[in-house]
Amino acid sequence: MSCFSHVMNPITGENSWQEREDDYDYHQEVANAGFGDMLHDWERNQKYFAALRKTIKGMRAAGREVHVLDIGTGTGILSMMALKAGADSVTACEAFLPMANCAAKIFTDNGVGDKVQLIRKRSTDIKIGADLDMPQRANLLVAELLDTELIGEGAISIYNHAHAELLTDDALCIPARARCYAQVAQSPLASQWNSLKILPSLDGEALLRPPEQLKSCKGEAALHDVQLSQLPAGTFRLLTEPIEIFQLDFQRKEKREKQREKLVQLQASQPGAAELVFYWWDIQLDDQGEILLSCAPYWAHPELNELSASKEERVPVANVVPWRDHWMQAIYYVPKPPQLATAGQDFYLSCHHDEYSLWFDAMLEAPAKTVRRHTCSCDLHMTYSRSRIGQLNQAIRNKRYLRYLEATIVPKQSNVLVLGNGCMLGLASAALGAASVQLHEPHRFSRRLIDSIVQHNELKNVKYVENVEQLEDTELIALSHVFAEPYFLNAILPWDNFYFGTLLMKLKDKLPEKVEISPCEARIFALPVEFLDLHKIRAPVGSCEGFDLRLFDEMVERSAEQAVSLVEAQPLWEYPSRALAEPQQLLSVDFANFNVEHHLQGSIELTQSGVCNGIALWVDWHLDKTNNPKSIVSTGPSEAVVPGEFVKWDMFVRQGVHFPRKPTDLSGRVAWSTDFKPLLGQLNFGFSQEKR
């Protein structure tokens, strides 16, 4: 049975009714739950299994029965490991019903359906007693309740409740404890994700300066989770060694504190600005701390030397440490970075956590009182994503737009309409002397931020437009330029910004014949690649540590077919990929004739050996009709693609990715099709792999 859902179309900008199966939300939740990523984490699986074997063997040797509680069992993999390791009884709980039902079938398929008691509820709702959920307390808890911040999924409260209500006084836990680490760093590149810089002209003079409220804003305390190992080596400087800041003892019977703070005195290893805190954690899975799993970036990983010695030749050193996307590293931005003038200079790092999150500050003097969690006071951080803030600061990108604007804006004569959200570059046309600039800014917070920049820079003749259809005919006929980056807050995939074309068509008949439209064209490109790891988020598991998980694969595949787009957005700079061919154009859109439909097909010859486990897609925006590379702004590779080599991707935008259902390492070609219906806002791609 199907139903209709109200869905925003990013290309048309309109809400529409879409027919979907009535269990669409269920399938979407299953497909995006992320269990597959964890099951491909070989180190996690092997070390959990080793810890279970060691712990259960030790309990047996001490003459103890072993009654295991598995909180958040997922596929049931840890419960099955516990049984195989010799547990007397295993109780598994899972509140996500689709996953719980799948686990029940997996237990049966693996011959343990009658040996695991499955409870379909949260652990905090479980009751102990005769005829209740569990007949007795467990004396071994195994769980994976962690995220990038360690505590973001509620681990503190869940462990506190488990020890109080579900576990014996002498219960052991896997993992036994966790340690959190911080390392202070400076990075002009990474700091672009956090604050707005001066926008200079091509001659280096300041065109737009951020107002005082932006400069004084402390930003958001929230983590920026990234694959820290993929930050280019020359783009950051480590100012300290990694330091342990907090421990979380999962085995302790006493309650784990929900709020803690710690002030650490540090010495700078080299001069610099203490702009960033790099953060990660490790877990000791057994009581003795012998089985260690670290989420450290490669340069701080305790097993780097051993892993490097056994790595494949083509794998970069940054990728020798075990890959995982469910536990990454994080960047925290220091509100007011202190300048460390010399190596050896003392400074202080203030570390804090509440029940679900962490935050940091750095200062030259010890603070007299508790450092409060900081929040955005300038609209920038609460309105735009980290990648968008970085994009606004991207020098090469900005120069290409300014090259066009400085060449075409005639002071006191040009009348400019700017389409998009937070278009600082369009605003720059006012600083270049345009007679009038009208900014399409329907978003309240974005408009408020832009207006603060207008006021601070004393720009004249700037107006705001909430709805382009409200523009007077006399205003439209006077326009000399319609300009966009384009960027819209609702956009997820690069071509979602084709909304620029939709807005343009609403005005087309009233615009002067010689109006300058920029960008004038957009081209979508595709590149077959071999990912080192990213494909695992959609790849089937098959078996894991000897357990058959094909039922899980089938469930996820069924849901993905109904609820996952054939192309999804990913920040590809974080996920190394090797080009298997030259990029090929799939679509060219002329914005002056945006409403034209396109139905295209072709094929891409794979010129390199390897497994084509992904197809990357992006948009090139052509600012004018010259085809000059300096007039093209790409959302794809930041350097020329060389087949067989790793691709360097733009770090301030997400690209599109298609994951083939059945990747092949056979040489051949990728057949593709493109179907674009602009009036309906439909842009669909099809891909299939063919042998030569």
Curated annotation (Swiss-Prot):
Its EC number is 2.1.1.-. This is Protein arginine N-methyltransferase 7. The keyword Chloroplast does not apply. It is an enzyme of class 2 (transferase). CDD domains: AdoMet_MTases. PROSITE patterns: SAM_MT_PRMT. The gene is Art7. Belongs to the class I-like SAM-binding methyltransferase superfamily. Protein arginine N-methyltransferase family. PRMT7 subfamily. Essential arginine methyltransferase that can both catalyze the formation of omega-N monomethylarginine (MMA) and symmetrical dimethylarginine (sDMA). Specifically mediates the symmetrical dimethylation of arginine residues in the small nuclear ribonucleoproteins SmD1 and SmD3. Keywords: Methyltransferase, Repeat, S-adenosyl-L-methionine, Transferase. One of its GO terms (molecular function) is histone methyltransferase activity.
